Structure formats: C-alpha cells, structure tokens
Amino acid sequence: MIRVLLVDDSPVTLMVLQSILEKEPDISVIGQAKNGKEAIILASRLAPDIITMDINMPDLDGFATTRQIMERTPVPIIIVSGIDNLEEIRASFRAVEAGALAVFRKPPAYGDPDYEEAVSEFVNAIRTYSEVKVIRRRSNHLKVPKPEASTIQIPFQIHQDIRVIVIGASTGGPQVIQEIISNLPLGFPLPLVLVQHMSPGFIEGLALWLTESTGFPVSIAREGEVLQPGKLYVAPDGIHTGVTSDLRFSFSISPPEHNLRPSVSYLFRSAAKNLGSHVLGILLSGMGSDGAEELLQIRQNGGCTIIQDRDSSFVYGMPGAAEMLNAGMFSLPPVEIARFLRSLSERRQL
C-alpha cells in the first residue's frame, strides 16, 4: 500500500485529491496538511511513502517546506501546481531545486476535457515516484564548483566533428540539466537540444528556471528555427521535435512513442539519420526506455554517446536500457558529463 500525505491550503483541492486517490486499491491517504508547518510535522510523524505539495501557502510556502523536509526527513515529494500562473510555475521549479522530484498540474474540475488525462497522470505519478529513493539535502547545499577538464580521453575525431548535442531526460532530469549547464562556459561552441518528460504546461517554466538559476541561455524550440551555439533548446509540449541536416528544428504530430510526445526516441532518431557522426547523444535519469534504441543508432552511425551512471541516477530505467544495448560509449555522473562537455569545448578551440 502506498501511503500518501497531501499538502495544500485549499480544502477543496485536498478533497478533490483525496477523492481521486481513495478510488485506487493500492493507495492510501494517511494525512492532510493545510500549511507547510503542518506538513513538516506530519512528514516526520507519519513517515509517508510520498508527499504531494502545493506551492502557494501561507506562512511557509511549498519551496521552503520541501527544503526543510528534505533536510530533516527525506521523502519523495511531487509538486502539484496550477498551470495558469507563471510565477507559481517558477516557484515550483525552485522546489525541484530543493529536492522535489517533479512538477504536475492540479487535476481540473470533473467534466473538464482534460480531467481524465490529468487524473491518470496524477495517479501514475503517485505510483511511480513513491518508489524513488531520495537522500537528505544539506541546508548549506552549494552549487558544484566549475569542473576542471575531464580526464576521459576524447578521441580527436569526436571533438572536431560534433555539431549538435541532443539530450533526453525524465525523472530527476531538471536537476541534472541544471548542474550540467551551470558548469558550461560562456560562448559554448555547440547547440544543445533537450527532450524532458514533463506534465503539460510546465515547459516554459522549466526554461525560465534553468536560465535564471544557471545564467545559460535556454528557450523553447520553434519549428524551422536555426540552432545557435551556446544555447539550450527545450522541446515544446505535445510535439515531436527533430533536427535536420542543416541544423533546423522539424516538428511532427505523429503518434506518441513510448506513450510520449515529444519523445526522446524521435529526437535521437532524427539526429542519427540527418547528422550521422556529427552528434553527441546524452541519455539521463528516467523511467522506461525512451531513447535507448535510438542512442544506439547514434553510436552505430559514428556519433558519440553518454549515459548517466547508475549511482547518480534518480531512476536508472532509460540509461539502464541503453546500457543493456551497449549504446553508451561513456557512463558518467552529471559533474563528469559537464567536464566532458567543457573538454569538448576547449579542445575544439585548439
């Protein structure tokens, strides 16, 4: 039985979330907190398997509450937020930085066209994220210092030939992406393209949070746009995003892959097909196997491939599936991925 603590200052929202979850035979709501202070007490007293966290609450907001819980009694936390308020979305990603695993939209009212999809997404998130092993966050948590050059030997042909870096991520991805790009130099000589599995409505907030927290330029990809070096592009909601041979974005509304659109598989496959050996593919932490076979295609077509290592992954599903296929040339933690990219940048300039 999955034991859930609900945190929200709205009695109506608490009632709605409880009514959704109590229909599930494997889920039990063991408590409700109306503010952050109650949440901290109940998290310690009840030891839930997972907490759903609101952001805008009196006295102690969701960001501060998440931070204190992760410092004292670490437990999987998902942020359940509205998607109509950009400031609330931005605050949601600050909570991710403090240790929350993911951000999801609050289910709309019954009868709304998106109700069934949102409810299914919420319930699946409870089941999925309750299994993630989390660690205690230090109160004096600091950003990782700028990494030195990687000790990994990068073949000369690789650092001369790469034209684009494509990245796929799911569970734990935002934190890892933040760590990687915060350690890239200004004027990084290559474009980066990211597919991040995320609840609809939060991609713009993700891009804003990454830009503000790292100083690295991040934007939402646009169809036909020419990729520029030194910039991270994030695939938009609901659209498969690919790259062409002349480094432009191509979009598609073809059926979802792995029940996902955009999918990592679509991005990686387009890069392997259109750019061959000129691609660096990186597959980060996440559930399932999205992108694993296509990472192998990048490697088979002469590109360079990296998977996040098991120890640093929140969930080793996607990189683990790639490892089983021998798709990754390198298996690295985030700090080493950043070092690899810095070395790639520095050696290209020699």
Swiss-Prot record:
Protein localization: Cytoplasm
Catalytic residue list: 170, 197, 290
Catalytic activity: [protein]-L-glutamate 5-O-methyl ester + H2O = L-glutamyl-[protein] + methanol + H(+); L-glutaminyl-[protein] + H2O = L-glutamyl-[protein] + NH4(+)
Post-translational events: Phosphorylated by CheA. Phosphorylation of the N-terminal regulatory domain activates the methylesterase activity.
Cystine crosslinks: none
PTM annotation (4-aspartylphosphate): residues: 54
Free-text note regarding domains: Contains a C-terminal catalytic domain, and an N-terminal region which modulates catalytic activity.
Family statement drawn from the similarity comment of this UniProt entry: Belongs to the CheB family.
The name this protein goes by in its record: Protein-glutamate methylesterase/protein-glutamine glutaminase 2
UniProt source species: Methanospirillum hungatei JF-1 (strain ATCC 27890 / DSM 864 / NBRC 100397 / JF-1)
